[in-house]
Amino acid sequence: MKNSIKTMLSLAIAFVIYSPLAKAQNTPNSLNQPGYYHMALGDFEVIALSDGTTPQKLNELLTDAKPGEVEHLLKQHYQASTIECSVNAYLVKANGKLILIDAGTSDVYGPALGHITESLNKAGYKPEQIDAILLTHIHMDHIGGLMNGDKIAFPNATVYISKIEADYYLNPANKAKAVESAKRFFDGAEQKLRPILIAGKLRTFDFGGELFPGITPVAGFGHTPGHSFYAIESKGEKMLFLGDILVSDAVQLPEPSITSVYDYDAGQAATTRKKALAEAATAGYWVGVSHISFPGIGHIRADGKGYIWVPINYSASGRGQ
Ligand SMILES: [Zn+2]
């Protein structure tokens, strides 16, 4: 069990006082925004898909900060301590295949979220067309959309997840050992991932090779035991999907040591984040981030001891930047 006592305590306290993605937090709304954004990446196309937005109390969600530091950094970005947090997934068109990175929430978090299928339809695609789904990790805002009730939502897709992640969350013995507040992640895996496994549509991978030409999983551990990034590369252009290693650009870019109550191993998550940010800033490739303001695509630029977020420049054609 890698959780430090400190992490377990902070998780327990946070879940008792506040569950940021609780149904009661959501206000009824439909997805009034278009919910998709196209961009070309070499011969590939990336289409950001919005699952919706939901209020998040970042001053309670973010931990390992000095007193008042989170509020101060949010204020500098004209953000309140409770912000509308995006839940993004990404459709990659690569070599004739339609590959989804994460699957949104489905009906798990109420009407403000659960719009991936709607966004996919608006972008011109149907769930039956999806060939593969690459999961960054097994949390409900990333795997919820795999199932609609007891039906597989993307019936023709093979689902990919790191072996470490699947082995951890699909093992009841690990649930028995986990702190009470973390047991629901195992329940989520049983509800959303086990049926995919039973249907013979789950593929697990080790790191070190491509899943498809130009598409490579990269170890990004800490937020969960087997959390994965995905690198896509075409014609010299690259984008790295960072999952949940970065939750708030306003707070965790200037101070990458600040962690999240949802981190399985907060220390490891901080180390992974610092390495990923340094590499992205040095190499200058694109990044896609699940909870940065939609479409969550941009660049990371070094700024003093930290970094700043440079969002993608809007392009009506999706072919210019
Ligand atoms: Zn997430």
Listing of model-derived features with the role each one plays in the protein:
Residues 1-9:
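Bacterial N-terminal signal peptides that target proteins for export
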Residues 8-18:
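Bacterial N-terminal signal peptides
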Residues 51-52, 103-106, 138, 164-165, ...:
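Active-site metal-binding loops of divalent metal-dependent hydrolases
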Residues 150-156:
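Short, conserved loop/helix-junction motifs that constitute active-site signature segments
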Residues 231, 235-321:
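Cap/insert and terminal regions of metallo-dependent hydrolase folds
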